[in-house]
Structures are given as structure tokens and as C-alpha cells.
Amino acid sequence: MPTFVDQTKIEVQAGKGGDGMVAFRHEKYVPNGGPAGGDGGRGGSIIFVADSGLRTLMDFRYRRKFKADNGENGRIKSQYGRGAKDLYLKVPVGTTVYDFNTGELIGDLVEKGQELVVAKGGRGGRGNIHFATSVNTAPEIAENGEPGEDRVLRLELKLLADVGLVGFPSVGKSTLLSVTTKAKPKIAAYQFTTLTPNLGMVILPDGRDFSMADLPGLIEGASQGVGLGIQFLRHVERTKVILHLVSMDPNNGREAIEDYHTIRQELKSYATDLSDKRELIVASQMDIPGADKKLAQFRKDLEKESNDEPVYAISSVTHAGVSKLMNDTATLVEEVEKERVEEPKVVQKTKEYKYKAPQRNEFMVEKVGEHEFVVKGEQLERLVQMTNLDHQDGIMRLARRLKRLGVDDALREKGAVNGDDVAIGKFVFEFVQ
């Protein structure tokens, strides 16, 4: 069985747009031809696609950085550069995507084939055909391609199982899964045997079926991260029904009612309160001598608390009570599904996450040396980055735009004089009043 990976961190870099072209028409019968530089192509975006054939995030364990292709540069004769192909990355159904730095939820891939654009490719820069005016009929101005979005993401996988098996370690969850499905979990009589979730399909004689997940054992404090718990409580979020297994082994040194309440408290304390999910109480390991006496006490304790929910007594070793439990579980799953149908949820096939951009005029000036200044601002840095500085026309256009945005005034307020160095992003300019 492959290692189960249900949380990982990756970096995604969308492609840069192609640069616009500075070119002019040079044809035999067209003297003094005008501008003919084409636009650059758009950069490739990075798109997640939900794939029902994947079960883990293992593909991202050894490769953490993904980069889409850049767009082609514009060409002569007003020809556009070719746009880059988008990079599609397959993720398991049930993957939730967060911005690693802010913790913001970007998207939730819950349907097969659902897509999520997590990094958008930059637009292509405009060629000089766009900058001709009555004053400047032959502009040597073109834009560089826009940089693609660069993000650090946190991916979480939450299993999409109809039924989740919860309980203390070694209460028989893996054994129950193995005798009711074709899943082959590791089984042994010691704590934390199950270190990874196992998923199987229960198929009943009447044709009904449901998926069931054996989740690693919980202990007190799991919702706060004690033991393995919080890593796996997230998988319970998507289940329709919980089978809460309580061991009737009289030799484990624990009271059944205390075990039951401990797990219930952990479910309730989790961030999204899992205690409201439909639950069947299962008294497991009834084949062990003395289990009947412990079961009687457990039922008596529940009655004292006015808990009249039925308790299913089973033995996965002898299969006693398992058939009825599975039939009643299937019925409960159907009931929950009918309740959910009454509140239909529309799932977008393709979603593009819109990252929040700062205000266009938002920038700050910092004096870092006697004659050195740094201007910081994401939109401003992008403007400089997209300006083709190989031509004087482009430099003058940038200077005019910076002045209109108030950069010159802000520099003077900080004490900048002629000849001082001004850094914007990766570029350094000489300040001229």
C-alpha cells in the first residue's frame, strides 16, 4: 500500500505573458511604413483537476514546484505571439486548496472533473501597433509580458466516504472494514495500528452499497492535535454517517461510557463540530470473554443519561451482528442523502480564484541610503516590469506615468534630489526633477 499523504505544501508559478514587439513595416511599395509590432501571447495558467482515480497527494510529495510555460513574444507584421498551454495538475477528489501564507480558502474540489485555476498566466504585452498617435506615428514603445501569478499553496485531502469508523485505537475498526469490504488494512492488537485512513466499498446482498473509511484511532485531545487525531478528524467532515465503535474488551482497563464520551467530545471540539453527524453506536469485540457484562453496564450508563439510541453488539471475528449493522447503516446513509437532496448544492465545473490586488496607486517610498531610495508597491512594480526599457520612447512613457501616479512628488517629500538612485522592483533609475 502506498504511503498516504493527506496534506502538503507546493509552489505554483503561472507563465509570463510574451513581450510585445517593436517593429515597422518595410515593404517595397510602402514608404515610411507605420508600426507593425504584434502582441505577445498569454502565459499558461495552472489548473487543478479533480481525478476520482487518485487516492492520495503522493504525487506532490517529491515534486513541490510547478511552472507553466511562458507566452511567445509578438512578431513583425503585426503577428501575435502564441499563447502558452495551461498546465493541468490532477488532484484527488476531496482536495481543499488554501493560500499557505494567509490561510485563505481558495477552492474545494468535490466532484470528478471539477477544475480550479490556482495561478493565472500573465497577459501578453502590447506591441507598438497600439501606441501610434497623431503626434507620434512611429512609436518605439512596447510592453513586456505580464508576470504570471506566483503562489504558495497548502493542499488538504479529506476523504469522500459515506461512512466513517471512529473510536479509540484498537477497538476493531480495521477488522470491521476488512470483513465487510475488500479493503486490506493492517491489523494487529496494539495502539495506533492504523496510521493511514483506509477506504472500502460495502456491497449488500440487496444491491445497496456505500463507501466506508477506517480512520486512525482518536485519543483525548485529538481535536487540539494530540496524537494522530487532528490529522484525521478532517476526513470525518465529509462523511454522511459515523459508526462509533466502543470496545467491550473487559481487559483494556477503560470504562466504555468514558470512552464514548471522550470521542464525542473530540468530535464536538473540532473546528467544524462533527458531533451533529448521524451516528450509530457499535459495541465491538463481543467475542472476548466478559464482553457481555461490560455491554450491559454500558447500556445501563447510557440509559441513565437518557440516551435511548440503540447499541449494535458485534464481533468482526465471528461476524455476529455485522449483517444487521451494515443494513441499518445503508438505510441511514439513504436517509441522509435524501435530506441533502432537499438542499441542492450547485458545483461550478471550473472556478478561477481571484486574488485580491492592492489599489493601483498604493505605494510607499523608503530612504535606504544618503542618495538611495526604494519605491515599493505591487502594481507599481508590475508597471515597471512590463515596460520595455530598451527604447527611449518606452522610458519616457514610464516617466510620465510615474509622475501622474505621484511617485515624483513622494520622492521629493522624502528628500530626493537630482542624481539620486531610485529602485523600483529589480530596476534602478536616476532621479531627475
Swiss-Prot record:
Its cofactor is Mg(2+). GO terms for molecular function: GTP binding; GTPase activity; magnesium ion binding. Keywords: Cytoplasm, GTP-binding, Hydrolase, Magnesium, Metal-binding, Nucleotide-binding. It comes from the Bacteria. One of its GO terms (cellular component) is cytoplasm. An essential GTPase which binds GTP, GDP and possibly (p)ppGpp with moderate affinity, with high nucleotide exchange rates and a fairly low GTP hydrolysis rate. Plays a role in control of the cell cycle, stress response, ribosome biogenesis and in those bacteria that undergo differentiation, in morphogenesis control. This is GTPase Obg.
